[in-house]
Each structure stands twice: as structure tokens, then as C-alpha cells.
Design a protein with these regions (language model features):
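Nucleotide-sugar donor-binding/catalytic module of glycosyltransferases
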Residues: 1-216, 270-273
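Membrane-proximal basic amphipathic "stem/tether" segments
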Residues: 232-274
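Catalytic core of nucleotide-sugar-dependent glycosyltransferases
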Residues: 200-207, 213-238
Length: 274
């Protein structure tokens, strides 16, 4: 067994961020790892950057897609080749800000065999590195189940989960362009327990180029369908549906335009009163 923890890091044309993500994985106190970097058909210097690190650290493997497969397919491909008992997620524009992140999560899963997934808190920064917000997610399995239809209760790049749970749940749904993680967590909840450490372990870059911000309307529509799909498995469906419906309405072009105009007018009003 090479690496009790397999870190799966998909990347596509983000060489400027990739180095920091790689280094945050390699600098973990927990050393029994393998780092699988799935290069999703990048045509830039991504492969060269990976090769530089792989020269000095044999725990790194590049998995190169000949054509772009997208996030869900890339994740499944990486996990299929993973040799570890546990899978950790990391994105190319995020980094782990706690060197003991894996150590803490492995210890939790090793001592709580009934749990299959453990996440943690997240810090969001802008492209200049300024902190925008930090937050913790619901902690216990009971708390998570109460809110899982309201919003995604895990930061994707904070999680550690059992590989056999991923296999038993059927992996990431490759038909989803958004929220593939949220969908998987809801399937995980049907076969085991879920938990969030109350600590900040990952720093997430929030930019206008993030996948989940690229098509807000499509994402909102998909999230409504996810809530319908799992309404019999978790409580508070109607509350979650109304939250999702509100998000969908706000994503409509005319509403988005009116909201932008309103915010712009409020800004002018505040300036004029100074």
C-alpha cells in the first residue's frame, strides 16, 4: 500500500496557482501520502511544473487526460488509480493552510469507523490574497443531516473520505457540471456518518473565474433538481426548495440586471451623501 492518504488534485490551465496547492500538500505533517495530479488536457506549462516537483518527491504522479474531461470525470479517474485507504481533495487554486490537516482527519476516521467523511472550515480570499470571509460548517452527523438539503455542508477541498465509500456510492456523477460534490455527500449520508472538524484548514480562492460562478443560473437550476432527488432521504425539503428557488430567481438575467442597477444606485447615493 503506497500512501494511506491519496490526495487527488485536478488542474486545468492554472499554473500560477498550482505550485502553492502542491506545496501545501507536500508540507503536511502527515507524510504517508501520494499526490495524484490530474492534468485535464492543459496546453500550458502545467506538465513542466508537475515534473519539477516529481523530480524531488517520488510521491507525486501526473495523470494526463488527452482531452478535457471536466471535473467529475477527472476526479473519478484519479480516485480509480489511488492506492490509499483515504481520499483527500485539493483544487489547483486552493491550498491547505493547516499543516496538520491530514493528521487530524486521519486520526478522526481511524478512531470513528462508523464515519466515512470528515470535512473542516474554510477561509475565502480574493485574487490579491485578502481575506473575504471564514466560516465553519455544521459539526455533527445530526446537524449535517438537518441542513444538507438547504446548502452544501462541506467545503470540497477540506474533505477526507474513505475510498471504499466512494466506490460503494458510485463515485462522482459524471453527468453533473456543477455540485458534483454536494450530490456525492448526499449519497454518502445514505451509507455512513458525516462530520466536520471545527477548525479552519483550507484557503479557497474566490474569483470571477471559479467554475461554480461561471454559470450561476445553470448551477441554481441543478441545485433545485438535487434537492428534489434526495427529498425523501433528508428533512426540510420545502425549506431547501424555497432557498433554491430564490437563488434561481435571483440568477435570471433580468433580475440580475435589476439587482446590479439597484446596487449601483445605492453606491452613488452613499457617495453623494458624504
Amino acid at each position: 500500500m503506497i500512501g494511506i492518504v491519496s490526495i487527488v488534485l485536478p488542474t486545468h490551465k492554472r499554473p500560477n496557482f498550482l505550485r502553492k496547492a502542491i506545496e501545501s500538500a507536500l508540507f503536511q505533517n502527515y507524510k504517508d501520502i501520494e499526490l495524484l495530479i490530474i492534468n485535464d488536457a492543459s496546453s500550458d506549462e502545467t506538465s513542466e511544473i508537475i515534473a519539477q516537483y516529481a523530480k524531488t518527491d517520488g510521491r507525486i504522479t501526473e495523470i494526463k487526460n488527452e482531452k478535457q474531461l471536466g471535473l467529475a470525470r477527472s476526479l473519478n479517474r484519479g480516485i480509480q488509480q489511488a492506492k490509499g485507504l483515504y481520499i483527500a481533495r485539493l483544487d489547483d487554486d486552493d491550498f491547505w493552510s493547516d499543516a496538520r490537516k491530514l493528521e487530524k482527519q486521519v486520526k478522526f476516521l481511524e478512531t470513528h469507523p462508523e464515519y466515512i467523511l470528515v470535512g473542516a472550515g474554510q477561509i475565502r480570499i480574493d485574487e490579491k490574497g485578502n481575506e473575504r470571509i471564514r466560516y465553519l460548517f455544521p459539526e455533527t452527523d445530526e446537524q449535517i443531516r438537518k441542513v444538507i438539503l438547504l446548502n452544501n455542508p462541506f467545503a470540497h477541498t477540506s474533505v477526507l473520505f474513505r475510498k471504499n465509500a466512494w466506490k460503494n456510492a458510485g463515485g462522482y456523477d459524471e453527468n453533473l457540471d456543477f455540485s458534483e460534490d454536494w450530490d456525492l455527500w448526499m449519497r454518502f449520508g445514505k451509507i455512513g456518518k458525516l462530520y466536520n472538524l471545527q477548525e479552519y484548514v483550507v484557503t479557497y480562492l474566490q474569483s470571477n473565474q471559479n467554475r461554480s460562478n461561471f454559470n450561476v443560473q445553470a448551477n441554481a437550476r441543478l441545485n433545485l433538481n438535487l434537492r428534489r432527488k434526495y427529498q425523501k432521504d433528508y428533512p426540510h425539503f420545502w425549506k431547501g426548495f424555497l432557498i433554491g428557488l430564490g437563488a434561481y430567481v435571483l440568477s435570471l438575467p433580468i433580475v440580475y440586471l435589476l439587482r446590479s442597477r439597484l446596487l449601483q444606485n445605492l453606491s452613488y447615493w452613499k457617495i453623494s451623501r458624504r
